[in-house]
Amino acid sequence: MNASVAIQVLPAVKDDDKELCRIVDEVIAYIKSFGLYTVVGPFETTIEGDYDQLMEIVAGCQKVAIKAGCPAVSTYVKIVYKPEGDVLSIDEKISKHNK
């Protein structure tokens, strides 16, 4: 594993929390469909794996949100990338805080 990515997708849906959640849920399902280790949080979803695959997933998230019916989407991405591998895993970063 040479990368981890935290992604927050914000569909441009006004005053409709149910619709916003539905679209975000579709994006999360898309992310999970790749079978990578994924942690869903209240503000962002974190995934780890190969950098190139993660970038493809990030690019696809916007398309999934648009296809799900939102007219526009803002996406915030945090990336940790170490070409030689051995980035800290999600579990190494947070497991001590979730006991």
Question: Which stretches of residues belong to each language-model region?
Answer:
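Charge-rich, low-complexity N-terminal segments
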Residues: 1-99
